[in-house]
Amino acid sequence: MPLSRELQRRFVHSYIEQIASEREGRVPNGVYETSVVSFVFNHERIEGSSLTEWQTRTVFETRDTVLADSTTPGNVRETANHTKMFDFLFDSLDRELTPEFIKEIHLQLMAGVMDVPGQWKILGNGVGSVITARPEEVPTLIDCLVSEYNKYEPSLENIVRFHVRFETIHPFPDGNGRVGRAIAFRECLRAGLVPFIVTDASKETYYTSLDEFRAGVTTPLISYAEAMQVDFASTIAPMLADRSLSDSLLGKLGIERPDFKDDAGFVGPSTKSLKSSLDSVGKTGSEIKSDHKTHCTRRV
C-alpha cells in the first residue's frame, strides 16, 4: 500500500466528514453518491443482481423499490436496502463489532426480502466445495470469532482474516457475502484504513484468493485488498474538499491531476489574428466585443 498509516488516517477522517456533509445536502455526483453507487452496484452484481450501474444510481437517487424497466423486483428491493445499509454503517461507526450488530446489518440488507432477516441460519448451506458451519454451531463460532477479533489492534490483515472466517462460517441463510464485505468496509474506516470495495470486474481474483487463504496461502487476498484500497483512494482522492490532502494522496498514488489551462487545444485564428484580418478588409477592432473573450482557467 503506497499510503502511510498517517495519510490513510487523514483520508478516512476527511472522507467521513465529507460523507456526512454530502448526505445532509444531497450533493449530486459527489463522494457520497459515488461511494454508495460503487459499493452497492459491485457488491450486488457479484451476487448475481441484473441491475445496471445506471439502475443502481436511480434506486439510490429515488430511494424507490420499483423500477419500471426492471423485471427483477427482488434485485431492486435488495439494492434499495443496500443503500440504506450503507448509511447505517456510517451512523454506527462508534459501535464495537458484536454478534448482535452483525445481525442488525443483515436485517438492514434483507428486510422485506426474506422471512427472518437478522437471524442465524436454521438449515445447512454451502459455498461451492467449502464446508460451512452447521446451524447449531453458528452462535458459538460467531461469538468466538468476534471476541478474538476485538482482542487485537485493527489492521488490514486482521480485517481480511475476519472476513475469511466469517464467510466460511456462513452464518445466515443468504446475504453472507454482502454482510461480510460491509463489515470489512466499516472496520477499515473504524481502524483509520482506506476501505476497499470488491468490484465485479475483479471478482474471480477475489474468490480465488479467498480459497487460497483458506488453504493457508494468505498473501494473495491481502494483496488483493491492498490493490482495492488503492483503487478506492484513487477514485475518491480527486473529489475530497481538502485540496491539500487530495494533492498529497494523488502524489503518493502517482496520479496527475488534470491541468485546466487557457490553451484548451482550440484550432483556428486567435481573436488577435482575427482582428488583424478584419482590419485588413476595412473592419474595425470595435466589432470584436471584449465580452466574447474566453477564459478556461478553472480551479478543481
Feature-to-residue mapping (PLM):
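FIC/Doc superfamily catalytic core
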Residues: 1-174, 178-300
